[in-house]
Amino acid sequence: MKKLLTLLVLGTLLTLTACEEKGEVGEYDNWEDRNIAFIDSIAKVAEQNADSRWMILKAYNLGDSASLYKGNRNLFVYAHKQKDGTGTVSPLFNDSVRVHYSGRLMPTELHPQGLNFDKSYSGQTLDEETDVPYLNRTGSYVVGFTTALMHMKEGDNWTIYIPAYLGYGATSTSSIPEQSALIFDVQLARIYHYGYDTDTSWH
């Protein structure tokens, strides 16, 4: 699995480097097309599911008619399960959750792992002993992130790949260009069920 992803990232970087040598492409030039190609390559790895750890999740807001969306890779979230938790239920849209997360853009030559644009902890790496998981409502995130959360269980640790359409789309922020695919490392620490769990304090 790691070998496949390494080859995928290497191919992306080689393409970028070749273009830059010709003076044609900056880090964010042709960004939309490159992000679409990146998600397509991730989708192919997920579809092969060589290590049986991939999940392909249809966006939660598209209803149950999966056949209508078959073949459109921009309507799915691609999740690779890094660690299975011990929880038995997944959060619903109106539930609240505590999560550790780190978000980054697709890999580029300048940022081979992808430029980090946000994370829930202050240090370079997560310290589960001291870092308090971020609290928010399940449905308060972008569609792709919420979709993944609604399939996770407490303790799960996933890497999720979100097409731009299920992220910020044509909207840009100070650290996220428009039409950016998003990559998140997410650990679901706790679920608070709406109308039942009123104490959302940590520990």
Language model features by range: what are they?
Residues 19-203:
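Cross-family detector of peptidyl-prolyl cis-trans isomerase
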Residues 1-19:
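Sec-dependent bacterial lipoprotein signal peptides
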